[in-house]
Amino acid sequence: MTLRIGRALTNGVTKTFSKAGLTFVLLFGLAQFAFIAAINTLVEAFLAGLDLPAGATEGPASTPLSLPVSATVAGVLALVVLLALQAVNVVLIRVMAADRQVITRETYTRRMGWVLLNSIVASVVVGLLTMIGFVLLVIPGLFVLVSLLFAAVYIADRDENVLDAIRDSWGLASGNRWRLLGLVLVVFVGFFAVSFPLDFLLPTGSTLSLVASTVLNTVLVVYQLAVITDAYRQLRGEDRPGGGAEPSPDAAGV
């Protein structure tokens, strides 16, 4: 199958602003705000523990979105939120890879422990391989990036282990790596074209700037995953009309 970049980009918009897509925007957004608040709390605790001259840490305002909890609680919260983000990522991939408009019970219960474990390991492995490729030369890094683009999708959608997912992603990308690179670059450039103006329009470090950038980044993350899963469906020949999986009877109606 040949990847159609335009179709992936437009379908990504449609899926992002569907009922399920907007639900994921909300879930990702809430999780990101919780994570930012936990990290800001850790930063405040770290700065407070430093032996700095009086007034050295004083600023025009306190750290935005920090929590009135201890550093230990904030650290635990950050880890829990990261795990929750990974789980939401898995459910999103399953819903969009099946081309569903609703979130079914099966998408968030099916072998979730196994899939989460392999997803985390895959993120580390793919990240390291891509980083090594970029350190050696830029081209090998890009080659690895597009070749392993669907590893996380195979793990979430097909319940595969890390090695099988890497192998299948490599095979699926074969023959379409240039098109996949173009797709990644378009999304990457679009991401910065939309988010970069916020640095000029809103006060740096303000709560408003933090909220606006987090909301925008959340929408763009969901869009990116929608585009990748659409490309996955295209290359697997699952993008034909009526080819998507029908919602099962246990649909949650979200």
Task: Describe each PLM feature range.
Residues 1-163, 167, 171, 175-254:
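Hydrophobic alpha-helical membrane segments
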